[in-house]
Regions:
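Basic, amphipathic alpha-helical recognition segments used for DNA target recognition
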Residues: 202-204, 298, 348-349, 354-410
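Non-catalytic DNA-recognition/assembly elements of restriction-modification systems
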Residues: 220-282, 408-449
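Class I S-adenosyl-L-methionine
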Residues: 1-71, 75, 86, 158, ...
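Conserved Class I SAM-dependent methyltransferase catalytic core
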Residues: 62, 127-183, 195
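Conserved proline-anchored active-site loop of SAM-dependent methyltransferases
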Residues: 20-23, 32-46, 81-82, 96-119, ...
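Sequence-specific dsDNA recognition surfaces
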Residues: 265-280, 295-324
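S-adenosyl-L-methionine
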Residues: 73-94
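A short beta-sheet element
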Residues: 317-320, 324-373
Length: 449
């Protein structure tokens, strides 16, 4: 088995390692540990700044440790699982834990969403993957007032799965920085990643911090301070940059917009997702019911270039017939989030993939609503609400929270007629350009104060 795949190893680039060392505010670091040190790049970067500190590294890969012992003999090394019981046999490590504990933990732990275990925290059980269990271990072995600088999957900041855990984390540590790392930083990883800088709280100072800084790190290793969020019980516990930027933009729009703004759920009578054809290829046929996948949803239209049909007689699709005037919205996939189209009135019934949401609406013109969702107002919400590290997705609950600018009915009808006229044109680049121009017209109209 490939050693990288076996141990989920994706080593830290030198520039990122040096950046992580640089943002730690404490100049008086005496002990540093990395429980999954890989090629020990983080500890070597730390050595450049804290030359007189003691460095401790653990890794499960024995071959790597042999190289590290020859290259960086100053590191106290241990071969084993950084979360395993065998650490009890590491004497120098145990001596520090019995004393003041470690000043700094610096880490790029292995990521594996499916390597999950139940962990009890304050009498509450959490199902946590290996990377989050490493974070908990660091909170255990770092001294009060000590720092943890750790790389995690970006989904940790947004997934509902971690919502309560993120709240509990604020009781144990001050989160000084949340930083989204630029795409492509780690070779061989398609997942988005983030960097957290935390400081373990003093037991006698159990206060709740008032705000968290959320920033973006570009490929020049320059930080852009995008936003600072206030922490209170009424704030949705999401720490991802896109969502927090979305909240700020929505507040700005609500203050300036001259038209009513309503939540999408006010107009939705039915919201459903479709079914997958994976493993069901026998259901496809030359004639039957049209099956729509995200690849069929182009810019504000449904492509007919390579149609797929499924059997009319099979019960698998029985309850997901999609009626004309339903709105299709991309549910999952980075390239699909933000896709929208309407099933026009002249379409017969269709069925859809589970990668799509289908909305049936009343009280608002569906053609106008589809156009609105394609504007910057709609797109920033669809993309800002998306969650996850690898494959972004939107939940039904979040989708229904999208805010809709609702002009007068005559305005909705005006844009409806223009949209319908364009939809009857031949599919192609010219039609796509005209649709984009129409969306731009809608945006300019809604931006009027």
């Amino acid at each position: 088995m490939d050693i990288v795949k076996k141990y989920k190893q994706y080593f830290t680039p030198l520039d990122l390692a040096e950046f992580m060392v640089r943002i730690v505010p404490d100049c008086n670091i005496k002990t540093v540990i990395d429980l999954s040190m890989g090629e020990c790049g983080l500890l070597e970067a730390a050595k450049k700044r804290w030359k007189n500190a003691e460095f401790y590294g653990v890794d499960i890969d024995e071959n790597l440790l042999k190289k590290i012992h020859n290259k960086s003999p100053y590191i106290h090394i241990f071969n084993g699982d950084g979360l395993g019981k065998e650490l009890q046999n590491w004497g120098v490590y145990q001596n520090i834990l019995c004393g003041s504990k470690f000043d700094l933990a610096i880490a790029n732990p292995p990521f594996d969403f499916y390597d999950r275990k139940i962990v009890n925290i304050d009498n509450t059980g959490f199902s946590l993957p290996i990377e989050i269990r490493f974070l908990l271990k660091y909170l255990e072995i770092v001294k009060e007032g000590g720092y943890i600088c750790i790389i995690l999957p970006y989904g940790f900041l947004s997934l509902d799965l971690y919502k309560e855990f993120r709240k509990s984390l604020l009781n144990k540590a001050v989160i000084h920085k949340v930083i989204k790392i630029f795409e492509g930083c780690f070779e061989g990883i398609c997942a988005d990643t983030c960097l957290l800088l935390l400081q373990k709280k003093f037991s006698f100072k159990m206060y709740m911090q008032e705000s968290i800084s959320i920033e973006y790190l570009d490929n020049e290793y320059t930080l852009f301070k995008n936003t600072s969020i206030m922490i209170n019980d009424n704030v949705e516990n999401r720490l991802d940059l896109e969502y927090q930027n979305l909240l700020q933009k929505l507040d700005f729009i609500k203050e300036r917009c001259k038209y009513p703004i309503q939540i999408l759920s006010e107009y939705v009578t039915n919201c459903q997702r479709g079914k997958t054809l994976a493993g069901k290829k026998e259901l496809t046929t030359d004639k039957g019911i049209r099956f729509l996948h995200t690849t069929d949803v182009k810019y504000l239209e449904i492509s007919n270039k390579q149609p797929t049909y499924v059997s009319r007689t099979n019960d698998y699709f029985k309850k997901i017939d999609i009626a004309p005037l339903s709105i299709l919205i991309g549910r999952v996939g980075k390239a699909c989030i933000g896709k929208v189209a309407i099933i026009p009135e002249w379409y017969s019934k269709t069925v859809i993939s589970d990668c799509l949401f289908c909305l049936e609406t009343e009280g608002i013109d569906p053609y106008y609503l589809t156009l609105y969702l394609a504007t910057s107002f709609g797109q920033m919400q669809l993309k800002g609400l998306a969650k996850g590290s690898c494959s972004k997705y939107i939940t039904k609950k979040d989708l229904l929270t999208v805010w809709i600018i609702v002009p007068d009915v005559d305005i909705q009808i005006y844009f409806r007629e223009k949209y319908l006229k364009l939809m009857k044109k031949r599919e192609g680049a010219k039609k796509s350009l005209l649709l984009r121009q129409l969306v731009s017209e809608v945006e300019k109209f809604l931006e009027k104060e």
